[in-house]
């Protein structure tokens, strides 16, 4: 199926870099499309919705969920065309020099320019390799912690020894009834301070162990207990639990760039080699966020915003060489004049 409509810019990836690219391209009057693989916008922040984020300039500490909400609202300011659940698998060019984006669904998208903002690629959590485990994903087998409240007063076992697993254990220890942490190696690999906090807490750390079996409840809808096996002695022990959390890392899906039929230079066979202005080796194709690699690259959400603005400005000049290099700042931009009046009136009404 083809989307015959030609867009000025198509943004691939709906995380912070992609959402800000979408906002800024709308600000620059560009006909914009945003394509996201997941069912909702927000990107990797979905992995830690209740974690506090401190390093966005001018923004007081904010939860990942709230920041996502604000980023999505801002990204949709200029009513871009949005495609969710759409995985782009290849990028080519047609005879007219326009980009042709092929989706796994068979959909074809056309665009004058492209901004790749896929972060570290499509991240799929590594699943628990136990037969039949997937049936518990609708009940109490978790691959992320979306709400700490869900685990209040419950017995929880976390499998994993990296930063995320240790962070989750420390977050849940004060609210859960009991926290177990099982890890197949003899020491955790998370940040030293976080590991120290964990081992000095009430959580029970079970090193050199791994989940061997899931034992179902009487109705077979939930996991009632887990059987751990000691990796050194092969001894087993069963623990009654309410919730199981698995954090064994993520699998990176880099199919998009691997199938890019263009002379796109990469770093480490994954990241897009670019410039500080977000340009790639392919004219008209830009990168923003963690997927962009160059000397001096800042891997922060704040850095992604600058990448996005640079990418959009370059895309605008690529399409319209006579266009200004940058957009008018928002405080003096006529685009926001009507909305500013509405916001000021809202503030006046709230203060009455």
UniProtKB/Swiss-Prot annotation:
EC number: 1.18.1.2
Signal peptide: none
Family annotation (InterPro entries): FAD/NAD-bd_sf, FAD/NAD-binding_dom, Fd--NADP_Rdtase_type_2, Ferredoxin-NADP_redctase_2
Domain of life where this protein originates: Bacteria
Enzyme class: oxidoreductase
Molecular function terms from GO: ferredoxin-NADP+ reductase activity; flavin adenine dinucleotide binding; NADP binding
Co-factor requirement: FAD
HAMAP family, per database record: FENR2 (MF_01685)
Family under the similarity heading: Belongs to the ferredoxin--NADP reductase type 2 family.
Protein name in UniProt: Ferredoxin--NADP reductase 2
């Amino acid at each position: 199926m083809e989307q015959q409509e030609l867009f000025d810019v198509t943004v691939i990836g709906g995380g912070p870099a992609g959402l800000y690219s979408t906002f800024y391209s709308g600000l620059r009057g560009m006909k914009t499309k945003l394509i996201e693989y997941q069912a909702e916008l927000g990107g990797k922040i979905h992995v830690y919705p209740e974690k506090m984020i401190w390093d966005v300039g001018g923004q007081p500490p904010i939860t990942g969920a709230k920041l996502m909400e604000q980023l999505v609202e801002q990204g949709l300011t200029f009513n871009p065309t949005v495609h969710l659940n759409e995985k782009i698998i290849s990028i080519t060019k047609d005879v007219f020099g326009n980009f042709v984006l092929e989706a796994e669904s068979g959909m074809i998208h056309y665009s004058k320019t492209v901004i790749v903002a896929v972060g570290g690629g499509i991240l799929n959590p590594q699943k628990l390799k136990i037969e039949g485990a997937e049936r518990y994903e609708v009940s109490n087998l978790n691959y992320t912690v979306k709400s700490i409240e869900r685990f209040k007063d419950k017995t929880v076992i976390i499998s994993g020894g990296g930063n995320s697993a240790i962070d989750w254990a420390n977050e849940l220890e004060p609210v859960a009834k009991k926290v177990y942490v099982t890890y197949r190696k003899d020491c955790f690999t998370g940040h030293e301070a976080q590991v120290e906090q964990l081992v000095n807490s009430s959580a029970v750390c079970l090193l050199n162990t791994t989940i061997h079996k899931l034992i179902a409840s009487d109705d077979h809808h939930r996991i009632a207990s887990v059987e751990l096996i000691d990796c050194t002695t092969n001894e087993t022990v069963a623990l009654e639990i309410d919730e199981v959390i698995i954090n064994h890392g993520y699998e990176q899906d880099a199919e998009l760039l691997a199938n890019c039929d263009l002379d796109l230079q990469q770093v480490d066979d994954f990241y897009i080699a670019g410039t500080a202005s977000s340009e790639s080796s392919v004219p008209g194709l830009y990168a923003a966020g963690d997927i962009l690699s160059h000397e001096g690259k800042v891997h922060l959400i704040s850095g992604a915003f600058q990448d996005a603005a640079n990418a959009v400005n370059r895309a605008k000049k690529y399409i319209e060489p006579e266009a200004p290099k940058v957009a008018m700042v928002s405080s003096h931009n006529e685009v926001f004049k009507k909305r500013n009046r509405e916001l000021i009136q809202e503030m006046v009404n709230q203060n009455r």
